[in-house]
Design a protein with these regions (language model features):
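N-proximal low-complexity "stem/linker" segments adjacent to membrane-targeting elements
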Residues: 1-42
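Short, acidic, metal-binding catalytic loop of nucleotide-sugar glycosyltransferases
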Residues: 41-50
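Short aromatic/hydrophobic "clamp" motif used to bind/position activated sugar donors
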Residues: 104
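Conserved donor NDP-sugar-binding/catalytic core segment of glycosyltransferases
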Residues: 116-147
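Acidic donor-binding loop at a coil-to-helix junction in glycosyltransferase catalytic cores
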Residues: 186-193
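Catalytic core of nucleotide-sugar-dependent glycosyltransferases
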Residues: 209-210, 214-217, 223-250
Length: 334
């Protein structure tokens, strides 16, 4: 484990009877002193007993970590690790790396889990190998009440918006296959993770019973910052260019619901075909992603009306030049 991670309890977590847990509940923790005890208790009250709770304190400045330390001293299923503040993606990746369960369940430190959800979700994954994700029906708590009405899963919809909450049970092998949570993206990390896991196939099952209680508080994140939204969309387009091409006919747009229409209208203006040698698949992927990667990656070698940038792709160094249309006067002269 990274040197920057500090673990309070050196012994690995185990179930109440000392066996290796089947389910690892991972919980990022940042300044949730008022809620984290109830969140952990809701997990420990689960009817499914073969579980562990791995909490990663993401540089909290309140008493959150102390609350978890006290719980860990009295229940061997709870373990606390510390890291410098690096965000929930890093915290989740660290938690999974320290965990031992076959199945992974993210739970936020200010939410609550229903007693029956884990048992019901494990039964689905055990019996249906084609299912990759089992999600709960969710109710709001805190400053909002009622049902969180999320639509049924479809890849086409997932390309435009995330409709799978963070709390959903999945297999460790799928986590490893996609490389965990992307630590480059600054928001909507769950959206990126579900795209990575599901874009090549797999079913999503939603259980009909309420299995999770999502807390809405005054500082709950919103996707309204324009720069943050642009960053998220740019990162998703870079990481999942082929997926968006398949589902939306082109990149995800700032007006996400209109992406297919915008792409259909602008298709005549876009490049038509990418041709690369079959022996160089990393280069092929790089070329397909160039429209979104050129302006924000690589090292600029030359800049005038056109720019030249250098990129490292695997073991290769590629030099790419962009060609912009000349200004109106130059077009007339030419």
């Amino acid at each position: 484990m990274d040197e920057g991670i500090r673990q309070d309890l050196t012994a690995p977590t185990s179930t109440a009877d000392g066996s290796t847990p089947l389910v690892s509940v991972i919980m990022p923790l940042y300044n949730a002193e008022a809620y984290v005890e109830a969140a952990i208790h809701s997990v420990l009250a689960s009817s499914f007993r073969s579980l562990e709770v791995v909490v990663v304190d993401d540089g909290s400045t309140d008493g959150s970590a102390k609350v978890v330390e006290t719980l860990a001293e009295t229940d061997r299923r709870v373990r606390l690790l510390h890291q410098a503040n690096a965000g929930p993606c890093r915290a989740r990746n660290v938690a999974v790396a320290a965990s031992r369960g076959r199945y992974i369940l993210p739970v936020d430190a200010d939410d609550l889990l229903a007693p029956s959800f884990i048992a019901d979700a494990v039964a689905v994954l055990d019996q249906q190998p084609e299912v990759k994700v089992v999600r709960p029906t969710i109710d709001f708590i805190g400053e909002r009440s009622g049902r969180w009405h999320l639509p049924d899963f479809s890849l086409r919809l997932l390309a435009r918006r995330n409709h799978i909450a963070a709390c959903a049970l999945y297999r460790r092998e799928d986590f490893d296959r996609v490389g965990g949570y992307c630590e480059e993206i600054k928001a909507r990390e769950d959206w990126d993770f579900w795209i990575s896991m599901l874009k090549h196939g797999g079913k999503v099952v939603r259980l009909p019973e309420v299995g999770y209680y999502y807390r809405v508080v005054a500082h709950s994140k919103r996707f309204r910052d324009r720069k943050l939204a642009a960053h998220v969309i740019r990162t998703l387009n870079i990481r999942h260019a082929a997926f968006f091409e398949q589902q939306l006919g082109g990149p995800l747009r700032r007006m996400r619901s209109w992406s297919r229409w915008i792409n259909a209208l602008t298709r005549p203006l876009r490049y038509r075909k990418t041709v690369t040698a079959e022996v160089a698949p990393p280069v092929k992927q790089f070329v397909e992603e160039l429209p979104w990667r050129f302006a924000s990656e690589g090292r600029e070698i030359f800049k005038n009306r056109n720019a030249i940038r250098r990129f490292e792709v695997g073991e290769d160094t590629l030099v790419v030049k962009e060609f912009c249309l000349p200004h109106a006067f130059n077009r007339f002269v030419y």
